[in-house]
Amino acid sequence: MELLLNKLSTFGNALPGDITQGLIWGIMAIGVFITYKILDFADLTVDGTLGLGGVTAVVLISNGVPVPVAMLIAFLAGCMAGLCTALLNTMLGIPGILAGILTQLALYSVYLDINGKANAPISVDKFPLVISSRYVTAGNEVVDIICTVGTALLFVVLIIAALYWFFGTEYGMAIRATGCNSSMSKAEGINTKRTTIVALVLSNGFVGLAGALLAQYQGFADVNMGRGAIVIGLAAVIIGMVLGEVILRKRFNFIGKLSFTVIGAIVYFVVLRIVMLIGLSTDNTKMFSAIIVALFLAVPYIQKTSKTSFRKAGKRAANAAIDEAEHLGAALANSVNSPKKEGK
């Protein structure tokens, strides 16, 4: 009993940090949502873009650049990474997955060129960082915890509001149409290459911004901080889509999808914390992430096949009932006609 209470206490103390981390990674997941769900483009650039945004912000802040300006430049650095992938795909005809891998590999070298070493630390004691994990650990004032979580939430709300507005415009609808049916979009006169470029630029811009926030939150940027980011992003998107469809059903609109993508990231980190408290080694977190993605990816397929099976079973039962009714009808008709024949 005491062990259980200790674990619950540990979970409660870690929960604000997990929520904050989920909100930050949720911004990255929104970037993945733009390419994966809206554009239908498998973009692997994000593993490199996250680290690029982080190191850009850390190096600039360390050299006296105001934090908001450093974060804006990190966003633009992410946009440039997305532009590279987009140009490789649209102008050179390189498949999307390969284009993302090539850019991702190049970004590791860019990271080292910017920082000169694999790790770039930054302290909240020396610089006025926007967010820091120091304020969400056990022992801090409730006000500090609320302000830290609220800061991350404010970024999320502003980004969702901006994207909801943008994808409701004519150009945003053109991007969505490109993802739905590229051939039909071309027939309607939409420049699909341009919409692909804009979507990838926007997506990686938000990933770069998430990297800047994450580096400030954890107190450092690392060349490997983005490794496996695409898995976490996909996990957040898939978890969010499944939860949204279950909870909202027919009311699951575009803004709901954006919101539940972030909720999916929070759920991911909370579940990860629970599993770690149970006793899973931190060395197995990547494997656990892959299992989560696989399970949630399988949910729509299982639902579809189960519905199909139920439909087939229903049809078989209906056909059997019809056959039985016809058989009974024929039997009754024979029994009615038999006395008449005997009377004659």
Q: What label would you give each PLM region?
A:
Residues V32, V65-L105, V110, V156-V157, ...:
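Alpha-helical transmembrane segments within multi-pass membrane transporters and channels
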Residues N204-V207, G211-M287:
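Transmembrane alpha-helical segments in multi-pass inner-membrane proteins
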Residues A81, I145-I230, L234-A235:
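Helix-loop-helix "hairpin" substructures at the membrane interface of multi-pass membrane proteins
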Residues M1-M28, T56, N63-V69, E141-I145, ...:
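Membrane-interfacial amphipathic/re-entrant helices at transmembrane-helix boundaries
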Residues T35-G53, L88-L102, Y171-A174, V198, ...:
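Short, non-helical or kinked segments that cap or interrupt transmembrane helices
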Residues Y36-M91, G139-V142, V246-K250, L277:
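Membrane-embedded helix boundary and interhelical linker motif in transport proteins
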Residues G96, G100-G168, V198, D222-V223, ...:
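Transmembrane helix-bundle core of multi-pass membrane transporters
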Residues T10, C180-A187, N191-R194, I247, ...:
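Cytosolic-side transmembrane-helix boundaries in multi-pass membrane proteins
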